[in-house]
Amino acid sequence: KEVEYAVMILDELYHESPLSAAALSTRRNIPSPFIYRVLKKLEARDILEIRRGPKGGYSLKADCEKLTLYDVICAFENTFIVTECLKSDYECVHNNDFNCRMHRQFAWIQHLLKEEFQKANLSSLLEEDPE
């Protein structure tokens, strides 16, 4: 859910900034406890910046031509995995030490998804009229 909220926040800030946390929360109906957590993680990854004061608020810091959806996902997930069995420390109770057919399929799907998320820059995702 945090990644979904992050994309909504980035969409708002892409089109108008700076915006306060309260404005972002209201516009996208994101509960206050979540908005601050998401904003903090995006700021920690240098995706957003905050300006204090009466005309302050949150703004995009990262270049949206270079920032990818994968970068946004990684701001919230330590590792990008589609299923638990792809974790390096996962012990499968069904197949001992061997990678089963499902594991190989999930690994391939993960590879494809990661590639696509790395290709999808934020500018292309957030444009009003994508080509």
State the predicted function of each range.
Residues 1-30, 59:
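N-terminal helix-turn-helix DNA-binding core of bacterial DNA-binding proteins
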Residues 10, 39-40:
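Short, hydrophobic-biased segments on the C-terminal half of alpha helices
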Residues 33:
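Key DNA-contact positions within bacterial/archaeal DNA-binding proteins
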Residues 46:
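Glycine-centered, phosphate/nucleic-acid-interacting loop/turn motifs that mediate DNA/RNA or nucleotide
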Residues 50:
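Short beta-strand "wing" residues that participate in macromolecule-binding interfaces
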Residues 54-61:
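Minor-groove-contacting beta-hairpin "wing" of winged helix-turn-helix DNA-binding domains
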Residues 61-131:
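Non-DNA-binding regulatory cores of transcription-related proteins
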